[in-house]
């Protein structure tokens, strides 16, 4: 690593005892410098040590990543709490240890590894390299590994786990996070993301296996081991074949005059959405040329999250206007989520929220089910949503007679529940989370932007034959099942103690262990606190949803029918808020509903979050 005498001298000094005055930190520094074989991340720690930056060293080395709503996720760079070669090796060693304990047939069934297109030059860290290291750890232990030979959408990994009957799988991705981040998303043999107790047990195993094993760094195994297989062609073919299960109007699709623009946000989605459109009988969607190929810097967008709306969809919307395309489809960088925009008659674009799209998907999937299975029992049918998402599916279910269930935030809970329902002979048509995560059908047990894009195109084409737009159909859905006006946004907060203070203040609002009874002028009917397991609406005051002690989440039900939730993000330094006014069918004064919702959100922010006092950063896009 060192190339001259000065570097050799520095290197020798660095391998002397580390006297920072903090024994825990000294131990962690020693471990990092002994174990890390990536020259760039090793050098980052050496430079911090050389410059006496003990606080940053402590921040990087004295804590570990934990499983959030989407696996392990952090910035790329040096340190035990970051995503890098060493922490991915450690995580995979822990995975191996846990899976070996759980599955006697681990060596027969194998493990799936996929990756997106992220990368960071300064730490020599890319999703592809991290995927190879993940595979190498397992290959060194004689585990068959199905390693995709190129980048794939995240849904391909859970799909492959089920198809190949593997014991588990990992997708290296940070989805729509900022370019600095990456992640390690774990799927169980069911094809659903891991939930408790697996996540806690894997973390314990990781902590027991922190020192890299002899061959864990040997990524040459990926090229030489006969146990490595490439599932790309087989899985892509089967996935596309399975898409036909949720395609209902292929002939109509092939004749449509509608044009679609698709952006893959510099990620993995382009090729796969093109193939999905082909399966559905469509002409290919028009790609946004500047965004169709992978770019780990996400050069043309302020942030790689299509959920942010018009500000990040600029190139797609302008191309659509030029091409006379009425609908824009945007998959996020790992293609597990979907944003949709439609050109309105007034010449403006309507970017649908996740909740609005869910209303359309819910109507569409149930309508298609009814037409295709006229004699089937509606009581066997289910739809699901996370508890912070719109209650529109609940309203549709009440009127149509099928079942609706809620889960904790995060698609891992939805996937796990769907698996249970399928095991009991139930039929699940659709599930969603408000952050533009949709699942049509059950071929994949995670959100899927590729299939959702094709389904939206089919829905739009079908409606177009009846001279109805997506926006007009959304209005019809609300007129039939009741208007559901919702607003979701967030504040950035980079100081965990501040976040804790905000939520503890709510729990002890006017006196110890007393939740607020009012939010400004709005009377609170019930409070549910998932962090503590409290729910004032239940006879025993205990939440029906599982307790989630590692995250903050409080839901308020107001006298006026509004439901609002404050929670911390499981993947980013955000405090999110969600609020929805649910009107009865026939109540069509949308102006009143919107004004009431706005007033309540203002009161929620002012009384509970106190952004000025707590130095919270308002959403900027």
Swiss-Prot record:
Binding residue positions for Mg(2+): 175, 332, 334, 336
Keyword Phosphoprotein: yes
Positions that bind alpha-D-glucose 1,6-bisphosphate: 73, 175, 336-337, 433, 435, 447
Keywords: Carbohydrate metabolism, Cytoplasm, Glucose metabolism, Isomerase, Magnesium, Metal-binding, Phosphoprotein, Transferase
Location relative to the cell: Cytoplasm, Cytosol
InterPro entries: A-D-PHexomutase_a/b/a-I, A-D-PHexomutase_a/b/a-I/II/III, A-D-PHexomutase_a/b/a-II, A-D-PHexomutase_a/b/a-III, A-D-PHexomutase_C_sf
Modification sites for Phosphoserine: 175
Top EC category: transferase
Gene3D superfamilies: Alpha-D-Glucose-1,6-Bisphosphate, subunit A, domain 3
Record-level GO cellular component terms: cytosol
Pfam family, one: PGM_PMM_III
EC numbers: 2.7.1.106
Gene Ontology BP terms: glucose metabolic process
Family the UniProt entry places it in: Belongs to the phosphohexose mutase family.
Function: Glucose 1,6-bisphosphate synthase using 1,3-bisphosphoglycerate as a phosphate donor and a series of 1-phosphate sugars, including glucose 1-phosphate, mannose 1-phosphate, ribose 1-phosphate and deoxyribose 1-phosphate, as acceptors. In vitro, also exhibits very low phosphopentomutase and phosphoglucomutase activity which are most probably not physiologically relevant.
Protein name: Glucose 1,6-bisphosphate synthase
Protein species of origin: Mus musculus
Lineage of the organism: Eukaryota, Metazoa, Chordata, Craniata, Vertebrata
Gene name of the encoded protein: Pgm2l1
């Amino acid at each position: 690593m060192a190339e001259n005498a000065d570097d050799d001298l520095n290197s020798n000094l660095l391998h002397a005892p580390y006297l920072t005055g903090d024994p825990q930190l000294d131990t962690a520094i020693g471990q990092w410098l002994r174990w890390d074989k990536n020259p760039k991340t090793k050098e980052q720690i050496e430079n911090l040590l050389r410059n006496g930056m003990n606080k940053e060293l402590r921040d990087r080395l004295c804590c570990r990543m934990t499983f959030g709503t989407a696996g392990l996720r952090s910035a790329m760079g040096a340190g035990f709490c970051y995503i890098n070669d060493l922490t991915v090796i450690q995580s995979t060693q822990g995975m191996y240890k846990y899976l070996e304990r759980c599955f006697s047939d681990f060596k027969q069934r194998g493990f799936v590894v996929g990756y997106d297109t992220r990368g960071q030059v300064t730490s020599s860290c890319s999703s592809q390299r991290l995927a190879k290291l993940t595979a190498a750890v397992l290959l060194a232990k004689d585990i068959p590994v199905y390693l995709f030979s190129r980048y794939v959408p995240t849904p391909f990994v859970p799909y492959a786990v089920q198809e190949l009957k593997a014991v588990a799988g990992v997708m290296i991705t940070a989805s729509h996070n900022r370019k600095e981040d990456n992640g390690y998303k774990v799927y169980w043999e069911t094809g659903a993301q891991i939930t408790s107790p697996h996540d806690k047990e894997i973390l314990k195993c990781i902590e027991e296996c922190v020192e890299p094993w002899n061959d864990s760094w040997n990524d040459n195994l990926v090229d030489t081991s006969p146990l490595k297989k490439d599932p790309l062609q087989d899985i892509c073919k089967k996935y596309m074949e399975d898409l036909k299960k949720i395609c209902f109007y292929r002939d109509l699709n092939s004749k449509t005059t509608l044009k679609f623009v698709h952006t893959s946000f510099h990620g993995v989605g382009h090729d796969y959405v093109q193939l999905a459109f082909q399966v559905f009988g469509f002409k290919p969607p028009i790609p946004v040329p500047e965004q169709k190929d992978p770019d780990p810097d996400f050069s043309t967008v302020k942030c790689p999250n299509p959920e942010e709306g018009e500000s990040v969809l600029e190139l797609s919307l302008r191309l659509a206007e030029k091409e006379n395309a009425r609908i824009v489809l945007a998959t996020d960088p790992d293609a597990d989520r979907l944003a949709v925009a439609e050109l309105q008659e007034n010449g403006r674009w309507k970017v649908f929220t996740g909740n609005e799209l869910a209303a359309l998907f819910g109507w569409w999937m149930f309508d298609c089910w009814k037409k295709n299975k006229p004699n089937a029992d509606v009581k066997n049918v289910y739809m699901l949503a996370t508890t912070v998402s719109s209650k529109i599916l609940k309203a549709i279910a009440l009127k149509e007679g099928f079942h609706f269930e809620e889960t904790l935030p995060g698609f891992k809970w939805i996937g796990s529940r769907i698996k249970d329902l399928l095991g009991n002979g139930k039929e699940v048509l659709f599930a969603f989370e408000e952050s533009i995560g949709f699942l049509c059908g059950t071929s994949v047990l995670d959100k899927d932007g590729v299939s959702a894009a094709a389904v939206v195109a089919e829905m739009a084409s079908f409606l177009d034959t009846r001279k109805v737009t997506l926006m007009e159909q959304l209005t019809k859905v609300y007129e039939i099942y009741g208007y559901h006006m919702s607003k979701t946004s967030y504040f950035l907060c980079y100081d965990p103690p501040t976040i804790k203070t905000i939520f503890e203040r709510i729990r002890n609002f006017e006196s110890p262990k007393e939740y607020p009874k009012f939010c400004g002028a709005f009377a609170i009917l019930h409070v549910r606190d998932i962090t503590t397991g409290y729910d004032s609406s239940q006879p025993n005051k205990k939440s029906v949803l599982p307790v989630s002690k590692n995250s903050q989440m409080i839901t308020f039900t107001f006298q006026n029918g509004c439901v609002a939730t404050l929670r911390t993000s499981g993947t980013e330094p955000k405090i999110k808020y969600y609020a929805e006014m649910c009107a009865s069918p026939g109540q069509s004064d949308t102006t009143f509903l919107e004004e009431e919702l706005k007033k309540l959100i203002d009161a929620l922010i002012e009384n509970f979050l106190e952004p000025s006092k707590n130095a919270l950063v308002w959403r900027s896009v």
